[in-house]
Amino acid sequence: VEVIDAVRTADLTPDPEACYRALSIRDARFDGRIFVGVTSTGIYCRPICPARTPKPENCRFFGSAAAAQEAGFRPCLRCRPETAPELATWRGTSNTVSRGLALIADGALDGDGSVDQLASRLGVGERQLRRLFDQHLGVSPIAVAQTRRVLFAKQLIHDSRLPMTEIASAAGFGSVRRFNETFQQLFKRPPSALRRKAVVALPEGSVAATG
């Protein structure tokens, strides 16, 4: 309880010592509440990641996957941040931000959607919405939407046999080219390479493995 309270005292900048204690024992209570960016690898992980615990000086802690990705870290291929419980993005947010997150999850910023249109749907100005997101989440609405697209697409790559064109569309990418460019930039490999890696890792008899 003491560790949880210590983390909660700072919504946007979780207490590093408390977070590292949770990371060192892979405390599942923090899954979805915090993410750790490892500066020596450029990867961000869930606190329950099975990889060897990094040194404290190599860790940066974030309250959301979007904040970690905005800081330049890419998602871990082992613990798969896209499967973490969606707790942190809703904790301590205002009603406007919570509604905005729900609309973003529904695709409000996909395709031709803009932050100005999102703000209008929420009944606030664009600048006010950006300020609220920065205040409560530490990132912009666009950053949240971009992270959601990447993590949702990555989940579909791992957990389905859908063609890449359908995954790009379902995740809200404007084009397959943009989809491929984003994954190449983040993971230094095309989406198809992640699909091959996922298929190899699938246990025999799983739904995705058997088609």
PLM segments and residue spans:
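Catalytic cores of secreted or luminal carbohydrate-active enzymes
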Residues: 182, 186-205
